[in-house]
UniProtKB/Swiss-Prot annotation:
Keywords: FAD, Flavoprotein, Oxidoreductase, Tricarboxylic acid cycle. It is an enzyme of class 1 (oxidoreductase). GO terms for biological process: tricarboxylic acid cycle. Pfam families: Mqo. This is Probable malate:quinone oxidoreductase. It comes from the Bacteria. PANTHER family: L-2-HYDROXYGLUTARATE DEHYDROGENASE, MITOCHONDRIAL (PTHR43104:SF2). Pathway: Carbohydrate metabolism; tricarboxylic acid cycle; oxaloacetate from (S)-malate (quinone route): step 1/1. InterPro entries: FAD/NAD-bd_sf, MQO. The gene is mqo. Its EC number is 1.1.5.4. SUPFAM superfamilies: FAD/NAD(P)-binding domain. It catalyses: (S)-malate + a quinone = a quinol + oxaloacetate. Its cofactor is FAD.
Amino acid sequence: MSMEFDAVIIGGGVSGCATFYTLSEYSSLKRVAIVEKCSKLAQISSSAKANSQTIHDGSIETNYTPEKAKKVRLSAYKTRQYALNKGLQNEVIFETQKMAIGVGDEECEFMKKRYESFKEIFVGLEEFDKQKIKELEPNVILGANGIDRHENIVGHGYQKDWSTMNFAKLSENFVEEALKLRPNNQVFLNFKVKKIEKRNDTYAVISEDAEEVYAKFVLVNAGSYALPLAQSMGYGLDLGCLPVAGSFYFVPDLLKGKVYTVQNPKLPFAAVHGDPDAVIKGKTRIGPTALTMPKLERNKCWLKGISLELLKMDLNKDVFKIAFDLMSDKEIRNYVFKNMVFELPIIGKRKFLKDAQKIIPSLSLEDLEYAHGFGEVRPQVLDRTKRKLELGEKKICTHKGITFNMTPSPGATSCLQNALVDSQEIAAYLGESFELERFYKDLSPEELEN
């Protein structure tokens, strides 16, 4: 079996698998490979246990500006449309209601203004008063005594929307479809990349077991591991990484759909939200928390997996200065300490209960169950030159046949949009064609018309 490929994608999560499919379906590349360190695809950040299983289109994510929401909506549409085109309803993609709520006068005023800006972007977006929310999500309004909560509450969202996705199943489908189209493509599992070497006009991707695959172009979609690989080759040396791990709590099946809350604009992390679990029936997930930790990948044991690559990246005065500046802000500092407490046995659950009761006021301590093995690390990029935290996705384009992607949330939602950008770059670099018009026709006709 030949180990030479036009392109090799490092990382078998949903972003890498989406590009594997996009190159196979729409480009003229002959052979593409994925190398993945786990024994199965999508076992880390794209696992159903690692994320909230949400298609983040911007309609209920209150930290998105209208400008960002317009872009994210188009990205989300591609992912949603792919699943519907392939007939993956109730297997990969699920239809539920969803809403964002404001609790208290200040948040209600914010939500009313937000609705006026966002109803033009999202066709069919509905505004919900307290009575309508009670009709749709009774447990958001009813207190433990069966009496309506006293706070003013408004919201907006959809009574029915394809809003939930199992990104691990989606990853598997991308690869299945790609292999049907291009049987000469390859997927290498249990292939943990040790290093990447430039050899004349190709790259050698070398595993810890001394296996080698060769490519004219390498795309690194390796989540938290992308930046260490880039720095090992001399790229991205001006960047650091702040790994933020999210945890969840299970509660009984008390929500009919997704319920999001207003996010503090100072905080780069999602506000607590409630999501009926698409995989574990009868459970609702509340979270995530946000805990910084010295690891590129979460493990059950606190001391297991502390990352030497991360320490090498971050043990410098610029990163310490960024961290000091962040912690100098009282709100951010309190948020960090509060989330550290959430992880503690016994006391953590008591502290988290108050946050969870913002969504379901009748919750009791007995209702909360820490979701062991759920949640994963999201790499937040630190720009050492600008001395600040960079929000969202980060790309290192070398223009030398290798690109590195770091894709925290909503990277899974945007997987096909990111795959489009990467596939066009790869095809152009290799002198191959890419059928952009057909891509838009299949997955985003709105952009074709515009």
